[in-house]
Amino acid sequence: MPLVSVCMTTYNHEAYISQAIESVLAQHTDFGVEIVIGEDCSTDSTLEICRQYEQQYPDVVRVVTSPQNVGMHANYRRTIEACRGEYIAMLDGDDYFSDSNKLQMQVGAIEEAGAAMCYTRSERKSQTKITIYPQGKLHDSFADMLILNTAENCTTLARRDMILRYYD
């Protein structure tokens, strides 16, 4: 049983999905990690790329799909429900982890603090690699984080039970 599940939702991300998956496979951890990909009936070659990774890494990569597109919200829900890890890290098919120690550091931080979730600063870039949003400032309080809403989805790691309780 993996300690961390990476919940990766995707739709028409053929240009990005390999980088997203490879960034998880490159993680240095002392625990098990699985990648659960919610593929929402892409019209490009995203599903084929995901299936190739599933065949190459059958103990790590699982693809969740359906005969018809279910939309972003339902795709997240079914992918989260398919995750088996105690923790879930979010990563969409057009994002990637830039630090190969990300998951190890975040699990350590959550376990040391006894927290339910954590997130990191991030930098958002355009398709041409131009920085749109530079790394955000550190927040002084939980209220700041909620009001400023700068916790990017792809930086979040949370306890699975908390996500299932609150994600609707």
Residue ranges and their predicted role:
Residues M1-D168:
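Nucleotide-sugar donor-binding/catalytic module of glycosyltransferases
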